[in-house]
């Protein structure tokens, strides 16, 4: 079933919308949640919460593409769960968040709605300008929380080369955001 048809089911308040979402994007959402939480049961719970949150937000929202929409909801729910579970512990997600936090705007004035939209556009433009391999590695690290070791294995690179590529890409992103007026 196409995304538009599934969104229409949500808008009609048809419970089959959840079943269709699960059929089409269940494994995708589980992958996102599992990468962050590293626990199958917790990931399943987050995926179910994702369906509920999607049900609660459509309507009023009407996403053009359902995959990034449910992916974003799932990722945010998983990050929230991770934060609750690991207030004292350090893990892969904490490392990822620390790495990316260095280059994202941090004060409240930079995080109003308009700035958030502008930042989203800047990030998308930045990512589009990267070579395909670099873009894929960057997204896998900072969206899916893949470890440097996983990325090195998948892309047939040394871990040190992946770490350096990520560092250089973060530095380029930081420079790009500063040129556009964001305080980082």
Could you describe each region identified by the protein language model?
Residues 7-31:
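A short, charge-rich alpha-helical start-of-domain segment used by transcription regulators
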Residues 12-15, 106-139, 144-146, 153, ...:
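Amphipathic alpha-helical segment used for protein-protein interaction
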Residues 21, 25, 29, 50, ...:
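Residue-level preference for hydrophobic side chains embedded in well-ordered alpha helices
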Residues 65, 134, 143, 148-182:
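DNA-recognition helix of helix-turn-helix
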């Amino acid at each position: 079933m196409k995304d538009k048809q599934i969104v229409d089911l949500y808008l009609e308040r048809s419970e089959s919308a959840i079943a269709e979402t699960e059929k089409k994007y269940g494994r995708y959402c589980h992958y996102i949640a599992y990468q962050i939480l590293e626990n199958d049961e917790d990931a399943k719970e987050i995926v179910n919460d994702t369906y509920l949150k999607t049900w609660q937000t459509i309507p009023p929202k009407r996403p053009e593409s359902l995959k990034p929409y449910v992916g974003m909801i799932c990722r945010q729910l998983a990050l929230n769960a991770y934060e609750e579970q690991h207030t004292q512990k350090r893990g892969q997600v904490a490392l990822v968040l620390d790495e990316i936090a260095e280059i994202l705007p941090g004060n409240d004035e930079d995080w109003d709605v308009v700035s958030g939209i502008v930042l989203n556009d800047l990030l998308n433009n930045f990512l589009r300008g990267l070579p395909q391999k670099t873009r894929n590695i960057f997204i896998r690290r900072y969206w899916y929380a893949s470890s440097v070791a996983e990325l090195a294995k998948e892309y047939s690179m040394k871990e040190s080369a992946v770490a350096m590529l990520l560092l250089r890409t973060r530095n380029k992103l930081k420079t790009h955001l500063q040129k556009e007026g964001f305080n980082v």
